[in-house]
């Protein structure tokens, strides 16, 4: 009789151990899935995030010059300086100096229509490699060059002015702009950098995991 009881108890312990191991494996799998989800969010880069050189679960980006972007949880721009830039009535409200963002067939911001001038963007994957902006009596072209870490290292800024002189109708100037990064946040997004020693600072907030 004691042998039967011992066998029964051993079977119970074995079943209990298997159940605990199964639960432990399920818990570990769930933990791994959650960790991967958090890693994916930390490294996520949408076209809209790439537009402002950022990645991760970004909620807001505020530049010291006053521009503020708000993103949804999917990484899409919701508002720019408090309004929807994809439906903005630029010419209907010229006094507000609004900007209207236009997308290309892949969903990238390819043109910003302003009350004064327009800017056209050229992309290579998820990087902006060039923009062309109309300025008073001329045109400005900026070409970006990226380093191994995916950050802009320098830009070539070419400006063409109409001089209205018969012998030299166009004046062209070229300036190399060197980017240096001073501070990064916990998501490795830059928060302070200089362009030819001129500082730019921004504050970034993030969505908390659900």
Regions found by a protein language model. Give the residues of each.
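Buried hydrophobic residues that stabilize the cores of well-folded domains
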Residues: 18-210
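Sec-dependent N-terminal signal peptides
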Residues: 1-5
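C-terminal motif of bacterial Sec signal peptides marking the signal peptidase cleavage site
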Residues: 12-15
């Amino acid at each position: 009789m004691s042998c039967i009881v011992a066998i029964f108890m051993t079977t119970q312990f074995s079943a209990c151990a298997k159940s605990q191991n199964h639960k432990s494996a399920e818990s570990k799998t769930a933990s791994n899935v959650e960790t991967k989800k958090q890693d994916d969010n930390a490294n996520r880069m949408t076209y809209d995030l790439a537009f402002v050189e950022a990645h991760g679960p970004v909620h807001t980006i505020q530049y010291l010059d006053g521009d503020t972007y708000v993103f949804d949880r999917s990484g899409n721009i919701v508002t720019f300086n408090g309004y929807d830039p994809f439906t903005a009535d630029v010419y209907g409200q010229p006094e507000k100096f609004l900007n209207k963002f236009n997308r290309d067939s892949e969903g990238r911001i390819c043109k910003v229509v302003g009350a004064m001038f327009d800017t056209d963007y050229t992309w290579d994957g998820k990087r902006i490699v060039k923009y062309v902006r109309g300025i008073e009596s001329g045109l400005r072209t900026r070409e970006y060059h990226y380093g191994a870490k995916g950050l802009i290292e320098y830009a070539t800024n070419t400006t063409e002015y109409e001089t209205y002189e018969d012998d030299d109708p166009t004046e062209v100037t070229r300036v190399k702009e060197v980017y240096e990064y001073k501070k990064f946040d916990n998501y490795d997004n830059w928060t302070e950098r200089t362009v030819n020693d001129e500082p730019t600072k921004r504050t970034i907030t993030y969505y908390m995991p659900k």
